[in-house]
């Protein structure tokens, strides 16, 4: 499974939305109905799934699915 599909599955499960709604452009709050607690829990789930740490200052910059994909691509192998 490609990285995007892995991320898409985590987001869909965490936010209880259909995976088809989880597009690179989808914003967590505006498009997927997440609140601030949902976003924190989502970041934690992504950290656990991919074995990475997303510092708070970086997490604040992640507003859509594409941001997550880029961050994980850039940091997963670091």
From Swiss-Prot:
Keywords: Cytoplasm, Fatty acid biosynthesis, Fatty acid metabolism, Lipid biosynthesis, Lipid metabolism, Phosphopantetheine, Phosphoprotein. 4'-phosphopantetheine is transferred from CoA to a specific serine of apo-ACP by AcpS. This modification is essential for activity because fatty acids are bound in thioester linkage to the sulfhydryl of the prosthetic group. InterPro entries: ACP, ACP-like_sf, PKS_PP-bd, PP-bd_ACP, Ppantetheine_attach_site. GO terms for molecular function: acyl binding; acyl carrier activity; phosphopantetheine binding. The lineage of its organism: Bacteria, Pseudomonadati, Campylobacterota, Epsilonproteobacteria, Campylobacterales. This is Acyl carrier protein. It is found in: Cytoplasm. One of its GO terms (cellular component) is cytosol. The modification O-(pantetheine 4'-phosphoryl)serine is found at residue 36. Residues 1-76 form the Carrier domain. It comes from Helicobacter pylori (strain P12). Pfam families: PP-binding (PF00550). The keyword Lipid biosynthesis applies.
């Amino acid at each position: 499974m490609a990285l995007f599909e892995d991320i898409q599955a985590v987001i869909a499960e965490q936010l209880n939305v259909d995976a088809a709604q989880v597009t690179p452009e989808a914003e967590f709050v505006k498009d997927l109905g997440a609140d601030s607690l949902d976003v924190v829990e989502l970041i934690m789930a992504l950290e656990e799934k991919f074995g990475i740490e997303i510092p708070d200052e970086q997490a604040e910059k992640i507003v859509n699915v594409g941001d997550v994909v880029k961050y994980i691509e850039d940091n997963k192998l670091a």
